[in-house]
Amino acid sequence: MGRILQKKKNRSGAPRVKQKSNRLKNGNKKINVLGNAIIAQNWDKKLTLTQNYRRLGLASQLNAPTGGAENKPDDPSNGRQEADSLHLLPSLASVKMIKPAEMRVERDPATGKILRVIHPENETEEVEIAGRKHRRANPLEDPLNEVGDDVLNNTALRIHGSSTSSAVVQALERQAALEEEALKKKQPRQQSKREEEWLERLVAKHGDNIIAMVRDTRLNPMQQTEGDIKRRLKKWREKRGNV
């Protein structure tokens, strides 16, 4: 039977009703990135989402990059992986750039042969406690433990400086501050006069028995729940001063 109705639909000249799809051609969900007026004014439709966010000084995603970065042929640093202290790679030592540095050499006093090379990095791994040098403890093998505090502070300052230098970010921060102030000044909802009269009738008839108020079909025709009536009574009593 259903097949006959389908054949009638196919023969009919009436246009088919098509629902408006909220997805792109590749099947991904369409995201409204222009919800904010400041971002919409500074948005470049010729660039991708990541490129626009990078140009505006914003972060398109909070997670660390996992690959798929765009290779620019004009970039002189292309093909050379720089060490980033905050991207936890499998081996931090493998991505460090080799730079000329000074180090101490321990020689045999008799033959003059080099016995040991003391790198500056090894010196920073030791901490002096009560006159004795101890190796830095890292029982959990935290990769961030290898990153110095000065590197983390410089990275944080660099990220903060780049974000504040953008006019778009400053405008967004001002907008967020104004919205936060408006939210603080917003007054809570006040009970109307008819609502207060309704609560007075409920209390006059049932006292503190909220379950009886819920089951009263005359005074509670809208079937307000027990929790809803309890919240309304609490606000009503706080206003009257008899909590």
Curated annotation (Swiss-Prot):
Residues 71-82 have a biased composition (Basic and acidic residues). Keywords: Nucleus, Ribonucleoprotein, Ribosome biogenesis, rRNA processing. Belongs to the NOP16 family. The keyword Nucleus applies. InterPro entries: Ribosome_biogenesis_Nop16. Involved in the biogenesis of the 60S ribosomal subunit. One of its GO terms (cellular component) is nucleolus. Component of the pre-66S ribosomal particle. It is found in: Nucleus, Nucleolus. The gene is NOP16. It comes from Ajellomyces capsulatus (strain NAm1 / WU24). This is Nucleolar protein 16. It comes from the Eukaryota. It holds the Pfam family Nop16. Residues 1-22, 60-82 are annotated as: Disordered. GO terms for biological process: ribosomal large subunit biogenesis; rRNA processing.
